[in-house]
Amino acid sequence: MDMYQKREMRKNKKMEENTKSLPSASINWYPGHMARTLREIKHDLKLIDIVLIVLDARIPHSSLNKEVYELVKSKTVIMVFNKSDLAAIPSITEAQNKYKKDGCYTICTNSVTGEGIDKLKELIRTLGEKIKYGNKTSESFKKIKKVYRALVVGIPNVGKSSLINKLSGRNSAEVGNKPGITKRRQWIKVGQDIEIMDTPGLLSKNLNEDNRGERLAIVGTIKPEVIDEELIAHTLISILMSNDWYMSMFKARYDLDPDIDSLTEPKILEQVGRKRGALLKGDRVDTLKAARILLEDYRTGKIGKVNLE
C-alpha cells in the first residue's frame, strides 16, 4: 500500500467518524441566546444600511451562520475574510468568488495588525452613500451630515470585536482570545460618519453538517471544555497529512520522522508531544498537552497557512 492509498484510507476513516468528538448536547447555544439575538437582529435591520459578516478566512464556509445570512441577505452584505494572514490566498480567492456570485462584496482583513481596515471603511462609506443617497450631487446635498450604519455579525472568536476596535481606533468592544466575549448589542462610532452595531457571536444550529463542527473546534470557535481536544487534534493531523505541502510544513515544525505516513493520528500526536517535551512520569507522552500545543500552534499560524476547507 503506497502513501497515497494510506492518505485516502485516513480521509475515509475521518469521514466515517464524523463529529463524534463534538458532544453537541453540551453546546448550549439554543434556544435562548441564539433565538433572542436573531429576534433583535431582525428588529434592528430597519436601522441598518450594510451588514458585515465576519468570517474566518481558514474556514470561510463553515464560519458562515446560514440562518443569520438568510435573515440579513436582503441588505447590502460585505463578507469580511478576517485572519486572512493565516489562510492560503488561492483558497480565499475561491471562496470570495463564490460569495460575489451570491451578490455579496468581499474584503480581507487582519484585525490584529489592522491590515485591510482602511479599505473596509472606504467600502462602507462608498456603499453607504450609494444606498442612502443614490446619485445626488447638489451643493446642498454635499453639506448634509451623512451617517452610515453597519451591523457586524459572526461566529464566536472570529475577531469581530478586534475588528470593530481597529475600525473605531479605540477599545470600544470587549476583546478576548476565547469564544463568547461580546454578550450584548452595542453601538460604536467610527469617525463622524459611521456607526457600527456589534452583536454576540452566533454559532450555527447544526454543528454536524458537513463536519463543520470539527473545523470550528480546530480554529477555536467552540469552547475547549465541551470538546475532546485530543480527537480534534487527530482531525487536524488527518488534514495536515492529506496534502503534500501541509505535511511538509507539519513535519518541519515538529521535526517529525520522514516515514510517519504509516502511523495513525494518535501515534503522530505522540511524536509531536515527545518532540515538544510533553511528558509524564515514566517517559509517557501527555497526549492532552500535546493536543493543546498542536492546536495552539495551528491557531496562531506557527505551522503555516493551512486552510481546512
Provide a role label for each language-model segment.
Residues 1-51, 58-59, 64-66, 73-77, ...:
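Helix-rich effector regions associated with P-loop NTPase G domains
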Residues 53, 100, 115-116, 128-129, ...:
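Long, charged, alpha-helical interaction scaffolds
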Residues 69-71, 95-98, 169, 212-216:
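Glycine-rich, phosphate-binding/catalytic loops in enzymes
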Residues 78, 84-153, 172, 277-279, ...:
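Canonical P-loop GTPase G-domain recognition
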Residues 111, 164, 194-197:
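Conserved active-site beta-strand-loop modules that form the wall/rim of enzyme catalytic pockets
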Residues 119, 123, 162, 235, ...:
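Alpha-helical scaffold segments in soluble metabolic enzymes
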Residues 131-135, 165, 171-177, 243-248:
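Short, structured loop/turn "capping" segments at alpha-beta junctions
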Residues 148-169, 199:
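Glycine-rich phosphate-binding P-loop
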